[in-house]
Structures are given as C-alpha cells and as structure tokens.
Amino acid sequence: MARLNTVADAMSTLKNASDTGRAECIVQPAGRLIGELLRIMKEAGYIKEYTRIEDGRGGQFKVVMSGLINKCGCISPRYSVSLDEMEYWEQLYLPSKNIGMLMISTSKGVMGHHDARRNGVGGELLGYVY
C-alpha cells in the first residue's frame, strides 16, 4: 500500500514512541523533508539524535527519543502563512506562546516559526511539536 502522507506517518510514529516511553524508534521512509524536520526537532531538544540507515527500500531514520514530546503532528493541507498571520497559527496549534514550535518550509529552507519570524519570511506550515 502506498503512503499518502509520509510527514504525518513520521509525526505519528514519534508521538506513539514518546507516549509509550520508548528510548528509540524507526521512522521510514527516510526522505529529505523528514530529515529536515528531525534536524529542527533535534536543535530544539525534542529528540536527542537521529541517524539515517540505508536499507535499499527508501531508507529509514533511527531516532533516539528525549521524552520531551507531549504532542506532535502534521498540518494538512499545508497552509501558506505570511509573517503577519504567524500568530493566528500559533494560537491554533500551540498551547501557549512560549511553548512548542511550528515547522515551516520557507524559501530559505525548513525552519521553526521563531527562526522564520527572526528572518522575516513566511512559508508553508508542515507540522507542530510541543
């Protein structure tokens, strides 16, 4: 069966692993976009580390969990968000202004919403984590 939304599958794998208290999990297939989302989550401290494993079938990521993920998810459809609209989407998906992070695909790469606001760019919403 074909996977329709690999980002949603990856986020649900991370959430399930965090909810069950696992130390690590396997996210597959290993795409570039999922790798960028994992990089952002690692920089923010939501995961400890991740490594790419080539298995000849699309690859996979081995993710070491830090136990800090309360909820994460994919935002579908991928709404376009301008700099002025960022606060609306924060209120919609995050529990508080200082807790959590929206992940946005911008013209300068994939980044968290705090970095996007600092750089003065908008983009498409990919997911959230807190």
From Swiss-Prot:
GO process terms (BP): translation
Species this chain originates from: Methanospirillum hungatei JF-1 (strain ATCC 27890 / DSM 864 / NBRC 100397 / JF-1)
Record Pfam families: Ribosomal_S8
Disulfide bond positions: none
Function statement: One of the primary rRNA binding proteins, it binds directly to 16S rRNA central domain where it helps coordinate assembly of the platform of the 30S subunit.
Sequence similarity: Belongs to the universal ribosomal protein uS8 family.
A GO cellular-component term linked to this record: ribosome
SUPFAM superfamilies in the cross-refs: Ribosomal protein S8
Protein name: Small ribosomal subunit protein uS8
Keywords: Ribonucleoprotein, Ribosomal protein, RNA-binding, rRNA-binding
Gene coding for it: rps8
GO molecular function, one term: structural constituent of ribosome
Subunit structure: Part of the 30S ribosomal subunit.
